[in-house]
């Protein structure tokens, strides 16, 4: 059986053929500002979000997302949400979800310019400004790209025999410099840091096509990494889709998923969600005599939430009847990046990192 036949038989793939690029109007070598503009029309069945996170020099960690609907299982209508998480070095932790009317949401198509009430997320693939307020928390951050915009092939994961179901991803700023001011009840802080921005969208409920994914990004020494391992749902054969990008001194080292091996170690059952969690996830990238080993090792959880707990009323009853037990876990721990040449360790670096496990399916 040929490689082409094998690929055709797969029910979950990353779109990467010349025909895919042509159909989607994308270049295999460059990324255009419109790609970070609105990619859906906010219609029923679609979803989209713009995401930013930063590790700040004062020890704080911030996450901001502008989301057109939180209903990723069965998106039916525009129901915009601002998500703002802030972790402070003194141990205080804030998780905010603020819901807005559809009329308060807008997103430009030619570049990133998303407005949600008085909040704004705007940029041009190189420099972004994120302004967000949720109750007593507010942040105003500027993100300037250091690692160039990147996407895994076209960025589109396609599902089904006809490949009509899509989930797409654009890491517009794999790593950038951040200047930020944030306040808690008027207590203002100004600092700098390292940040990241990406953009997701799709036309099918994620729980229909994805069983689970690990997603991570981080920086250690001269290295920047984005690493994800997506497992398609049972209907699509639990097909794995590895995603990997490694840069050194802001220059791409490698991003060929065929050269990546993914491993889970120290698997335990999370008590709150009942999901199997790997204490360590490891991505090994082999290219000729060079081998890069990227490991994420958990020290504690930032959050561990059952998705049904955020669903209310009739939707909650329906979710229970469907035995839906999806979960979202976010971890803090150590990122270690080591480079070997001909089997000999050349260099190794370690740094703090944040990563996540999104688990839509039943534990397996």
Q: Where is each model-derived feature located?
A:
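Structured soluble/peripheral alpha/beta segments that form catalytic or ligand/cofactor-binding pockets
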Residues: 1-364
